[in-house]
Amino acid sequence: MSNIESIVEKLSSLTLLQAAELSKRLEEEWGVSAAAPVAVVASAAGESAAAVAEKTEFEVFLEGFDAKKKISVIKEVRAITELGLKEAKDFVESAPKSLKTGVSKDEAEELKKKLEAAGATIILR
């Protein structure tokens, strides 16, 4: 019996719990993820795969900010959210936090650009 066949035989005899443990250990050992890649299939109507997979709503997430530019970030958050000065300050200081949800891609990118120019660290989700 070859090495490959004996490995297949041993793996086939594992219980579900043992297989899950093996998967975790291999992920840690090799630094990879066992998550399956997501494949997008074009529909019969002829839609392109890019159009099907494109996200339409985004969340602007305040990850943090440059301490030297805190005042600029507070001003920008205040302008975007229409919060009062104290509320905007508290919001910025409580980062990481979601700033705005359900916005279009263009609006999210514009907000990100403004906030990063002010000194914030922004993630679009």
Curated annotation (Swiss-Prot):
GO terms for molecular function: mRNA binding; structural constituent of ribosome. InterPro entries: Ribosomal_bL12, Ribosomal_bL12_C, Ribosomal_bL12_C/ClpS-like, Ribosomal_bL12_oligo, Ribosomal_bL12_oligo_N_sf. One of its GO terms (biological process) is translation. The keyword tRNA processing does not apply. Gene3D superfamilies: 3.30.1390.10, Single helix bin. One of its GO terms (cellular component) is ribonucleoprotein complex. Homodimer. Part of the ribosomal stalk of the 50S ribosomal subunit. Forms a multimeric L10(L12)X complex, where L10 forms an elongated spine to which 2 to 4 L12 dimers bind in a sequential fashion. Binds GTP-bound translation factors. PANTHER family: 39S RIBOSOMAL PROTEIN L12, LARGE RIBOSOMAL SUBUNIT PROTEIN BL12M. Belongs to the bacterial ribosomal protein bL12 family. This is Large ribosomal subunit protein bL12. The lineage of its organism: Bacteria, Pseudomonadati, Pseudomonadota, Alphaproteobacteria, Hyphomicrobiales.
